[in-house]
Amino acid sequence: AGQDGFMRF
């Protein structure tokens, strides 16, 4: 989560 800026919550 948040490794590629996709799951940036």
Curated annotation (Swiss-Prot):
Keywords of this entry: Amidation, Neuropeptide, Secreted
Record-given protein name: CalliFMRFamide-13
Cellular compartment(s): Secreted
Main location: secreted
Domain of life: Eukaryota
Positions bearing Phenylalanine amide: 9
A Gene Ontology cellular-component term: extracellular region
